[in-house]
UniProtKB/Swiss-Prot annotation:
EC numbers for this chain: 2.8.1.4
Subcellular localization(s) per the UniProt record: Cytoplasm
Family, per entry: Belongs to the ThiI family.
Listed name of the protein: tRNA sulfurtransferase
Domain Rhodanese: 404-482
Pathway: Cofactor biosynthesis; thiamine diphosphate biosynthesis
Active-site positions on this chain: 456
Superkingdom: Bacteria
One Pfam assignment: ThiI
Cystine pairings recorded for this chain: 344-456
Entry keywords, A to Z: ATP-binding, Cytoplasm, Disulfide bond, Nucleotide-binding, Redox-active center, RNA-binding, Thiamine biosynthesis, Transferase, tRNA-binding
GO cellular component: cytosol
Principal subcellular localization: cytoplasm
Gene that produces this protein: thiI
């Protein structure tokens, strides 16, 4: 099988040296992502496209899906590459490929041509289109808004029969811009802002301020791992978890109620800036949107920025909540966010929307900054690729099994799309489908007299969810790894 990768248009308008660098990085990213599916595949870069050739037909759908989620790719063409002799030969091959697809449909033919030929692209379009119209009685030519567009590419003596076109996410390849550190809470905003920076070519590391115990961290790990695995797995990234409960306790004890929200955000920026400096990261990323909550007024955002020299990026600053939720739905983090507890909003009962710098600084004079230094020093830094392994070590009380008993039911926790693409069937045991993002609200509705064997393809999400369910008091869960 063969795929032609078309570059994001902004890459094609760069200078020659920058364009070549971007294409080289994108080629490497594609190799890093696809090697998990087929180690023998070939990735070949050209000036205006990248070719991916693979032998394992069983991985066709998985490879195609992975390509649509790699930043820097505008669209993917799934093609059949065949030799041709003349225009009539092109027509015959197009007829064999598209006859069934064009039955009873309107169509047009579009041709791109490279190399020296005795014919032009328009001549091929007319010849092939006329031939298809004559030989398929129920088909009809329509040049504007047809039901089917027959895409053909002619390159020297080769004909590319385009079997399908699939849109990518666009943007710049990860690694073409510098690293950033996303302050992730697991909610709608931070997930979307992290995705937007990945799409713009940044390697995104994650910094999580834990205010709600182990269950909260497990939930946020799931979001971060999902984002990385889906859009950024071409690169190694860090997940830094900071236990911020001592800081919150100090704020509650020492800071005036109305100033707590701004002071907390200033402490978070101070801590994140220390982490960024430690790892050579150039900017912080937050999901703040102007006026969304009390701490996100211009006055308060300016005061928050003042505590650090580190650049703070706010890609959602002008977005409304509905737009953010729609984006979360598109990238697959909406259901995570809906079940994620929110802790920051309850810290202050009467928050100020226009904090005064002198008053904030006076309140902070009462704060013991050694507490902040200590929690940053004790921060837990995990390689995102090791989250699966670390989770496996943490889930010591959850048994992993490869077989099943009479009372066992396999619970397929993959997303609905994954289940539809590759349904799980295991002989001798019932399989129930419940996507991972619904477990927190729907698992209790299942028959609790059964033992539920959680399963996902790679075993990462099943272990995380098993730990979460154990934290919630469910003892009838195991991890199924055949």
């Amino acid at each position: 099988m063969k795929f032609i990768i078309k570059l994001f248009p902004e890459i094609t308008i760069k200078s020659q040296s920058v364009r070549l660098r971007f294409i080289k990085i994108l080629t490497g990213n594609i190799r890093n992502v696809l090697k998990h599916y087929d180690e023998t595949l070939a990735v070949v870069r050209h000036w205006d496209n990248i070719e991916v050739r693979a032998k394992d037909e069983n991985q066709r759908l998985a490879i195609r899906d992975a390509l649509t989620r790699i930043p820097g790719i505008h669209h993917i063409l799934e093609v059949e590459d065949v030799p041709f002799t003349d225009m009539h030969d092109i027509f015959e091959k197009a007829l064999a490929q598209y006859r069934e697809q064009l039955e009873g449909k309107t169509f047009c033919v579009r041709v791109k041509r490279r190399g020296k030929h005795e014919f032009s692209s328009i001549e091929v379009e007319r010849y092939v289109g006329g031939g298809l119209n004559q030989h398929i009685e129920s088909a009809r030519v329509k040049l504007t808004n047809p039901d089917v567009t027959v895409h053909l590419e002619v390159e020297d003596d080769r004909l590319l029969l385009i079997k399908g076109r699939y849109e990518g996410i666009g943007g710049f390849p990860i690694g073409t811009q510098e690293d950033v550190l996303s302050l992730i809470s697991g909610g709608f905003d931070s997930g979307v802002s992290s995705y937007m920076l990945m799409r713009r070519g940044c390697r995104v590391h994650y910094c999580f301020f834990n205010l709600g115990g182990a269950a909260h961290e497990i939930g946020v790990r799931q979001v971060a791992h999902y984002l990385w695995n889906r859009f950024g797995s071409s690169h190694r990234v860090r997940f830094v978890a900071i236990n911020f409960e001592p800081v919150v306790g100090e704020i509650l004890e020492k800071v005036d109620d109305g100033q707590m929200g701004v002071v907390l955000k200033r402490m978070m920026v101070r801590a994140a800036s220390k982490v960024a400096e430690r790892y050579g990261v150039q900017a912080l990323v937050t999901g703040e949107a102007l006026g969304q909550v009390s701490s996100q007024t211009l006055t308060n955002l300016r005061l928050i920025d003042n505590v650090s020299d580190t650049l703070i990026l706010r890609p959602l600053i002008s977005y409304d909540k509905e737009h953010i939720i729609n984006l979360a739905r598109q990238i697959g983090t909406e259901d995570f966010a809906r079940t994620m507890p929110e802790y920051c909003g309850v810290i202050s009962k009467s928050p100020t929307v226009k904090a005064i710098k002198a008053k904030i600084e006076a309140e902070e004079e009462n704060f013991d900054f050694s507490i902040l230094d200590k929690v940053v020093e004790e921060a837990n830094n995990v390689d995102m690729r090791e989250i699966a392994q670390q989770t496996q070590q943490e889930v010591v009380e959850v048994e992993t099994v490869s077989g099943f008993g009479a009372n066992d039911v396999i619970l397929d926790i993959r997303s609905v799309d994954e289940q539809d693409d590759k349904p799980l069937k295991v002989e001798g045991v019932d399989v129930v489908s419940l996507p991972f993002y619904k477990l927190s609200t729907k698992f209790g509705d299942l028959d609790q007299s059964k033992t539920w064997l959680l399963w996902c393809e790679r075993g990462v999400m099943s272990r995380l969810q098993a730990l979460y369910l154990r934290e919630q008091g469910f003892a009838n869960v195991k991890v199924y790894r055949p």
